Amino acid sequence: MEIERINDSTVKFFITYKDIESRGFDRDEIWYNRERGEELFFEMMNEANDREDFELEGPLWIQVHALEKGLEIVVTRGQISDGNVKLEIPVTQEDGDGQGQESSMMTEDDFLEESLEIVIGFADFEDIVDLSHNFFIDDINNTLVHFEGTYYLHVVFNDETYSEDEQDDMLSQMLEYGYESDLSIYRIMEYGKVIIDSNALTVVREQFPKRA
């Protein structure tokens, strides 16, 4: 994927359909499956943040051009107006040349919904064991998956149970034992192996003793 920083508020991507498929996405589903389209978009924005220090914050104006060999996406950060922003991942409409363009404003509400889940990678399985014995909040959804030699914990919070500050605090505790992964959970689930599909930390705690 090519990333070009246009200015302080704008970044341009070019991603081929081959690259999209190599990331575990189908080139058609990203248009018709909103959740999958969002996953790809957030994965791309994470790379932009890592490579160009372009943070995903505030309202974003998105232009998508569907080209013959891939997608050209221009993302511009705007200013928050009246503190109310709405997120919507764009869907393109093709013209007679098989190319299309769509512009859309992202909404903060859906971005916050996306931010309530995280994929945590671990350098060693023992780090997961240590986490399980030092983190005793069991009423969050968590799944353990093995993918390409690494263990990943997919964690989903219930925003009706915990406040945003409480979730941030819990994430900070968990990230003391692992790292936030940029990989999509869909890619990990599709090509990896599910080790424990629910209550993973509880199961690990019960099956593996705490290290001395």
From Swiss-Prot:
InterPro entries: MecA_C_sf, Neg-reg_MecA
GO molecular function annotations of the record: protein-macromolecule adaptor activity
Transmembrane segments: none
Pfam families to which the protein is assigned, alphabetical: MecA
GO BP annotations, alphabetical order: establishment of competence for transformation; negative regulation of establishment of competence for transformation; negative regulation of sporulation resulting in formation of a cellular spore; sporulation resulting in formation of a cellular spore
Keywords: Competence, Sporulation
Signal peptide: none
Domain comment as written in the entry: The N-terminal domain has binding sites for ComK and probably for unfolded/aggregated proteins; the C-terminal domain interacts with ClpC.
PANTHER family: ADAPTER PROTEIN MECA, ADAPTER PROTEIN MECA 1
Subunit structure: Homodimer.
Recorded family membership: Belongs to the MecA family.
Record's function text: Enables the recognition and targeting of unfolded and aggregated proteins to the ClpC protease or to other proteins involved in proteolysis. Acts negatively in the development of competence by binding ComK and recruiting it to the ClpCP protease. When overexpressed, inhibits sporulation. Also involved in Spx degradation by ClpC.
NCBIfam families per record: PRK02315.1-5
Name of the protein in question: Adapter protein MecA 2
Organism: Halalkalibacterium halodurans (strain ATCC BAA-125 / DSM 18197 / FERM 7344 / JCM 9153 / C-125) (Bacillus halodurans)
Species classification: Bacteria, Bacillati, Bacillota, Bacilli, Bacillales
Recorded name of the encoding gene: mecA2
